[in-house]
């Protein structure tokens, strides 16, 4: 990992970009955050806030994987419904973000990983500037056409674990067609990406989306 002083920080005319990563339990949110950190940490100054209901397991997993230095990863225990902590009452996460930015004032990006939740989960605009919603193919071919704010309103929709399609009888072409129908503006304002994070397939597209839509190269 490069020394942080050598990283070209985002223009300080702009506040840190806050990227919310949501999705059901087991969809691959933590793996995506891990791989985003490892792909982007040479170029950008990163910190992470993870959410779990009763533990700090995702913080532990990211730390063990070496995604970032341990002090750059903070876990919060939300209790109750995980969507409440990112939407109706985001105070616990807002406080965590403030604490991380006090420790790392040059941070360019704050990744906020929600606890696993249902298709209705969304991030408060006070907490997240960009939202990424992750589902996995193993949950069923029907998931994209079920709709819900995570699928229809997220800035980027990620269909993960594409390698499992033949094992669960899912047709990726059907999932893609349903996604295009549920996200009619997908080609411009609401894109989607098919990923297999085991092989890094699709990861570069997610990174490019964050850098482009997050104005990370703005002067």
Curated annotation (Swiss-Prot):
Keywords: Chaperone, Cytoplasm, GTP-binding, Nickel insertion, Nucleotide-binding. One of its GO terms (cellular component) is cytoplasm. One of its GO terms (biological process) is urea catabolic process. The keyword Nucleotide-binding applies. Facilitates the functional incorporation of the urease nickel metallocenter. This process requires GTP hydrolysis, probably effectuated by UreG. Belongs to the SIMIBI class G3E GTPase family. UreG subfamily. Homodimer. UreD, UreF and UreG form a complex that acts as a GTP-hydrolysis-dependent molecular chaperone, activating the urease apoprotein by helping to assemble the nickel containing metallocenter of UreC. The UreE protein probably delivers the nickel. This is Urease accessory protein UreG.
